[in-house]
């Protein structure tokens, strides 16, 4: 089965071209704008320059600390300013079209993005919340579809429609906080925030949407708003080498590499981008990543595929390749999806692989499979929902709005 996939992917292009560009609505949302951009919008509605810094701070607080969903909620902002903003702008986030809750507490949302082009279909992305005993992780998307064609990834089977804007990326986090009632001024169980970590591991390749991802993560990590530490934000890439160093310099978050193979021949099949940026170049970029240290280790993600990349020889070569890189290895049991050409490694083999890597001095946790009962493979909820009739989709949407 893997051989068939390899033949198919060998002929596939390394990267897809976006089918569309973003068209803003007539009344765009202020979410995702920098402080300088917010000041400019305030100037557009006649707020004097001497007041703009104060008004920006007020807006920032209401948007990202309190999670305001309308200008009317912003009671510390003058009524004239609120009215002026409401005439030209919104604070809308993506709309929840479907919500699924797993038996293990994992939540998955299908989010519809507003568009300013009546001729374009409204597009949808996925966002997943994974609660654990010591943290709550939100998995965020960066593209509608994906630039890449990774053989084992469900999103890789979808078209690349377009890049998300910074506002659409930040909006996913705000929707999750809305649904979980997790804003800073609200009570949560045990007094702790539910969303403590962000991972850019949803739909899309973040480093092929660099500027929007950078701008979004700088907003998310701002301690006067959403306030999630950069050490609790992880950006995952399949290996867009030219932008890895740039990510360290301009964003400064934790780095994860979707490695999945230790030989170029196999990685060319699993992650076709490897034909452009082979393993040696990728690992050198990791060695050069600004700020990497034992306290800020780079995570190497390794999906366990039965009979493909899970031998002890693979484990030995993995350890050899990572020598000198402050690293941990995240072993991921393959999450099957309809039509996939691979199977998950046997659990005994996963444990042997993990034990070898651990004994070589690397942390090698096996990621616990989560949300398998709710189409949790990345991109699968979107694909399955697209198959529904208009009436079925409307029913799903109504359920999501009333939950």
Swiss-Prot record:
Catalytic residues as annotated in Swiss-Prot or TrEMBL: 126, 378
UniProt cofactor(s): [4Fe-4S] cluster
Record's catalysed reaction(s): adenosine(2503) in 23S rRNA + 2 reduced [2Fe-2S]-[ferredoxin] + 2 S-adenosyl-L-methionine = 2-methyladenosine(2503) in 23S rRNA + 5'-deoxyadenosine + L-methionine + 2 oxidized [2Fe-2S]-[ferredoxin] + S-adenosyl-L-homocysteine; adenosine(37) in tRNA + 2 reduced [2Fe-2S]-[ferredoxin] + 2 S-adenosyl-L-methionine = 2-methyladenosine(37) in tRNA + 5'-deoxyadenosine + L-methionine + 2 oxidized [2Fe-2S]-[ferredoxin] + S-adenosyl-L-homocysteine
GO MF annotation list: 4 iron, 4 sulfur cluster binding; metal ion binding; rRNA (adenine(2503)-C2-)-methyltransferase activity; rRNA binding; tRNA (adenine(37)-C2)-methyltransferase activity; tRNA binding
EC nos: 2.1.1.192
Cross-referenced CDD domains: Radical_SAM
Binding of S-adenosyl-L-methionine, residues: 204-205, 236, 258-260, 335
EC category: transferase
One Pfam match: RlmN_N
Free-text comment on the cofactor: Binds 1 [4Fe-4S] cluster. The cluster is coordinated with 3 cysteines and an exchangeable S-adenosyl-L-methionine.
HAMAP family: RNA_methyltr_RlmN
Family in the record: Belongs to the radical SAM superfamily. RlmN family.
Name by which UniProt lists this protein: Dual-specificity RNA methyltransferase RlmN
Species assigned in the record: Bradyrhizobium sp. (strain ORS 278)
């Amino acid at each position: 089965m893997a051989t068939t996939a390899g033949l198919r992917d060998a002929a596939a292009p390394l990267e897809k071209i976006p089918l569309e560009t973003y068209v803003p609505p007539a009344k765009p949302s202020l979410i995702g704008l920098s402080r300088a951009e917010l000041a400019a919008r305030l100037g557009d509605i006649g707020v004097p320059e001497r007041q703009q810094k104060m008004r920006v701070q007020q807006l920032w607080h209401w948007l990202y600390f309190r999670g305001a969903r309308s200008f009317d909620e912003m009671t510390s902002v003058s009524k004239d300013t609120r009215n002026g903003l409401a005439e030209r702008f919104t604070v809308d986030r993506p709309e929840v079209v479907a919500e699924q809750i797993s038996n293990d507490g994992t939540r998955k949302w299908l989010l519809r993005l507003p568009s300013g082009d009546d001729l374009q279909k409204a597009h949808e992305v996925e966002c997943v919340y994974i609660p654990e005993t010591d943290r709550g992780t939100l998995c965020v998307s960066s593209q509608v579809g994906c630039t890449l064609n990774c053989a084992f990834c469900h999103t890789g089977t979808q078209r690349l429609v377009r890049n998300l804007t910074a506002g659409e990326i930040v909006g996913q986090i705000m929707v999750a906080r809305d649904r979980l009632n997790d804003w800073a001024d609200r009570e949560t169980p045990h007094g702790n925030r539910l969303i403590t970590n962000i991972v850019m591991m949803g739909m899309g390749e973040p480093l092929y949407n660099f500027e929007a991802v950078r701008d979004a993560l700088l907003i998310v990590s701002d301690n006067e708003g959403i306030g999630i530490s950069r050490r609790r934000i992880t950006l995952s890439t399949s290996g867009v080498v030219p932008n890895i160093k740039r990510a360290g310099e301009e964003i400064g978050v934790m780095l994860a590499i979707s490695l999945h193979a230790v030989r170029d021949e196999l990685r060319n099949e699993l992650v076709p981008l490897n034909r452009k940026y082979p393993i040696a170049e990728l690992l050198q970029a990791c060695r050069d990543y600004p700020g990497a240290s034992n306290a800020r280790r780079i995570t190497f993600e390794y999906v366990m595929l039965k009979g493909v990349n899970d031998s002890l020889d693979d484990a030995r070569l993995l350890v050899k390749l990572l020598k000198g890189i402050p690293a941990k290895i995240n072993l991921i049991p393959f999450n099957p999806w309809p039509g996939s050409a691979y199977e998950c490694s046997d659990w005994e083999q996963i444990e042997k692989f993990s034990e070898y890597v651990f004994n070589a001095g690397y942390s090698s946790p096996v990621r616990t499979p989560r949300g398998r009962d709710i189409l949790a493979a990345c991109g699968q909820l979107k694909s399955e929902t697209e198959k529904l009739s208009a009436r079925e989709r409307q029913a799903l949407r109504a359920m999501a709005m009333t939950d």
